[in-house]
UniProtKB/Swiss-Prot annotation:
Pfam families: Mur_ligase_C. Functions in two distinct reactions of the de novo folate biosynthetic pathway. Catalyzes the addition of a glutamate residue to dihydropteroate (7,8-dihydropteroate or H2Pte) to form dihydrofolate (7,8-dihydrofolate monoglutamate or H2Pte-Glu). Also catalyzes successive additions of L-glutamate to tetrahydrofolate or 10-formyltetrahydrofolate or 5,10-methylenetetrahydrofolate, leading to folylpolyglutamate derivatives. Its cofactor is Mg(2+). It comes from Buchnera aphidicola subsp. Acyrthosiphon pisum (strain APS). The keyword Transferase does not apply. It catalyses: 7,8-dihydropteroate + L-glutamate + ATP = 7,8-dihydrofolate + ADP + phosphate + H(+); (6S)-5,6,7,8-tetrahydrofolyl-(gamma-L-Glu)(n) + L-glutamate + ATP = (6S)-5,6,7,8-tetrahydrofolyl-(gamma-L-Glu)(n+1) + ADP + phosphate + H(+); 10-formyltetrahydrofolyl-(gamma-L-Glu)(n) + L-glutamate + ATP = 10-formyltetrahydrofolyl-(gamma-L-Glu)(n+1) + ADP + phosphate + H(+); (6R)-5,10-methylenetetrahydrofolyl-(gamma-L-Glu)(n) + L-glutamate + ATP = (6R)-5,10-methylenetetrahydrofolyl-(gamma-L-Glu)(n+1) + ADP + phosphate + H(+). This is Dihydrofolate synthase/folylpolyglutamate synthase. SUPFAM superfamilies: MurD-like peptide ligases, catalytic domain, MurD-like peptide ligases, peptide-binding domain. Mg(2+) 2 binds at residue 167.
Length: 411
């Protein structure tokens, strides 16, 4: 039984106990959303799906829209430190009391209907958005697309950043199957911006079935990287000598193309001023420089490959140490392999979740001669800190939870 005086932390503990084994089905979720008056929105809806780059694409959309004077809501997941990070209104998180109130509203209407944690908090987020007069709402898909809780809302424009191999136990073991799930966000006669160059056949099939209008990279829009600037090309505009960004250029370009396909007017001077300032915690976040201490949420092979490229760009002259925690359902070898020839010593440990790869499981994948398997991420980091010199680097990565645990340390 929920007490009306529950704090946010108590609410979250309660929500974590909700049905974890329920078969994903949006029917009941839509029923509750309709009762709450959430299915129809006056706001323009962006829905962002894809394997990598969802968060950074959302961040670019949010920044450019805000700096252009629009009222913007953002729903994203997971959070790194505090739950309130998941919902932003006009660039700011909300007070805990507002989240608690939205939870109470969902619980009153739920009346025993089984929901997962993510389904519950998605309804709560939509309640919060409804209370504000927003020009647009940006919804970051949690997992896949077709059966994701965010997909109860019909988007005006959807985005698929890319298609990679991840969450194979749920989405399928190949790109064709994974694309089929992500394309669940497609809507009839609506545009979907595609940032993937190697488009699986299933994406074309579903677009044809749903009469979705695909706007594809390298066909309808494109970008190119130069030495210290980049260019963007779209059917209506060409932008040259754009400043370098702190987020992946693929994310910046995908967001930019999406805005040009939307009803929103973004001035070129805003793009040039704002796009280089977009940053996202946990995405190649530099904590210090002497030595380099860098955190990154890379948790699949594609993201690990990008992380490896970013490490090359900063020209570390000394040794590189890695502090790594990974979930057991991930492609562990695929995550560590892109960095294998860079890492002098691995410090790895289980994470604080039942989904973690255990010490025994980690031992199977990491090289014996230069790996220490510790009890926790905190101990792993402290061990690395003993060895590191000012010309060296420590890279903390492998999962959102790895970065979250590290950033929560009182060090």
């Amino acid at each position: 039984m929920i007490n009306k005086n529950y704090s946010l932390s108590l609410w979250l503990k309660y929500l974590e106990q909700l049905d974890k084994k329920r078969i994903y089905n949006l029917t009941e979720l839509k029923f509750l959303a309709k009762k709450l008056g959430l299915l129809k929105s006056e706001s323009f809806i962006f829905t962002v799906a894809g394997t990598n780059g969802k968060g950074t694409t959302c961040a670019v959309l949010e920044r450019l829209l805000l700096d252009s004077g629009y009222q913007v809501g953002l729903y994203t997941s997971p959070h790194l430190i505090n739950f309130v990070e998941r919902v932003r209104i006009n660039g700011f998180v909300l007070h805990e009391e507002e989240h608690i109130d939205s939870f109470q509203n969902v619980e009153l209407v739920r009346n025993g209907v089984l929901l997962t944690y993510f389904e519950f908090i998605t309804l709560a987020a939509l309640i919060l958005f409804k209370r504000y007069s927003l020009d647009c709402i940006i919804l970051k898909v949690g997992l896949g697309g077709r059966l994701d809780a965010t997909n109860i809302i019909d988007s005006d424009i959807s985005i698929i950043t890319n298609i990679g191999i991840d969450h194979t136990s749920i989405l399928g073991r190949d790109r064709i199957s994974i694309a089929r799930e992500k394309c669940g966000v497609f809507r009839k006669n609506k545009i979907s911006v595609i940032g993937e160059t190697d488009i699986p056949c299933s994406m074309y099939q579903i677009a044809k079935e749903k009469k979705t209008i695909l706007k594809k990279i390298d066909i309808d829009w494109s970008w190119e990287k130069k030495r210290n600037y980049w260019n963007f090309f779209h059917s209506t505009i060409q932008l040259y000598n754009l400043p370098e960004t702190q987020v992946p250029l693929s994310s910046a370009a995908t967001a930019l193309s999406t805005l040009y396909y939307s009803r929103f007017k973004i001035k070129e001077k805003i793009i040039r001023k704002s796009i280089s300032n977009v940053q996202l915690p946990g995405r190649f976040q530099v904590i210090s420089t002497f030595p380099y201490i860098i955190v990154d949420v890379a948790h699949n092979p594609n993201a690990a490959f990008y992380l490896s490229q970013k490490i090359d760009e900063i020209n570390i002259t000394g040794k590189i140490y890695a502090v790594v925690g990974i979930l057991k359902d991930k492609d562990i070898l695929g995550i560590i392999d892109p960095l294998a020839n860079k890492i002098h010593h691995w410090f790895t440990a289980p994470l604080k979740t039942i989904r973690t790869a255990t010490k025994h499981e980690l031992k199977k994948f990491f090289p014996i001669h230069n790996t220490s398997i510790l009890k926790s991420i905190e101990i792993a980091y402290k061990k690395a800190l003993i060895l590191v010199k000012k010309e060296d680097a420590i890279i903390i990565f492998g999962s959102f939870l790895t970065v979250s645990e590290f950033l929560s340390l009182k060090i």
